[in-house]
Amino acid sequence: MADNARAKRLADLIREVVAQKLQRGIKDPRLGSQVTITDTRVTGDLREATVFYTVYGDDEERAAAAAGLESAKGVLRSAVGAAAGVKFTPTLTFVADALPDTAKTIEDLLDKARASDAKVREVSAGAQFAGDADPYRKPESDDESDTAAKTDGDAAE
């Protein structure tokens, strides 16, 4: 079993080789400039590699890019094998990265929360407390502070 540093180096190499090959080496129109390799993970035995990608476009373009990656899997694996120089070239599995969709969902939720906060701020702009500003805090009188100072002074002696 390989160490984690070697698996990370191989994952980085696979990401770079696949990205370069997609840009320059593969003539499939489904794999145009809209496909981006976001991450690569390699198993501990260096036999399986999962390549995460994003596609900028609608669902049809995503499906076309997935089909294009599946058809180019052998060419990409050969390029990785030539560049890596390992005994066994990892089997490539392409997975659409859910990160952009998740980020968009989070951004939508944050925008909704900001709008709700702004609405609450508008409503409470001229509002006042129902009672005193802080009903649990009692003003300290001079008599109490003098007696506290005397008891502190008595304790010091």
Curated annotation (Swiss-Prot):
Q: Where is this region: Disordered?
A: 124-157
Q: Does the keyword Cytoplasm apply?
A: yes
Q: Where in the cell is it found?
A: Cytoplasm
Assembly behavior: Monomer. Binds 30S ribosomal subunits, but not 50S ribosomal subunits or 70S ribosomes.
Major location category of this protein: cytoplasm
**Gene Ontology terms for molecular function:** ribosomal small subunit binding
Q: What gene is it encoded by?
A: rbfA
Q: What is the lineage of its organism?
A: Bacteria, Bacillati, Actinomycetota, Actinomycetes, Kitasatosporales
Q: Name one Pfam family in it.
A: RBFA
Q: Which NCBIfam families match?
A: rbfA
UniProt KW keywords:
Cytoplasm, Ribosome biogenesis
Function comment:
One of several proteins that assist in the late maturation steps of the functional core of the 30S ribosomal subunit. Associates with free 30S ribosomal subunits (but not with 30S subunits that are part of 70S ribosomes or polysomes). Required for efficient processing of 16S rRNA. May interact with the 5'-terminal helix region of 16S rRNA.
What family is this?
Belongs to the RbfA family.
PANTHER family recorded:
RIBOSOME-BINDING FACTOR A, CHLOROPLASTIC-RELATED
Biological process according to GO: maturation of SSU-rRNA
What is the official name of this protein in its record? Ribosome-binding factor A
User: Which is a Gene Ontology cellular component entry for this protein?
Assistant: cytosol
Q: Which organism is it from?
A: Streptomyces avermitilis (strain ATCC 31267 / DSM 46492 / JCM 5070 / NBRC 14893 / NCIMB 12804 / NRRL 8165 / MA-4680)
Record's compositionally biased regions (Basic and acidic residues): 147-157
Matches recorded under HAMAP family: RbfA
Superkingdom of the source? Bacteria
Keyword Cytoplasm found: yes
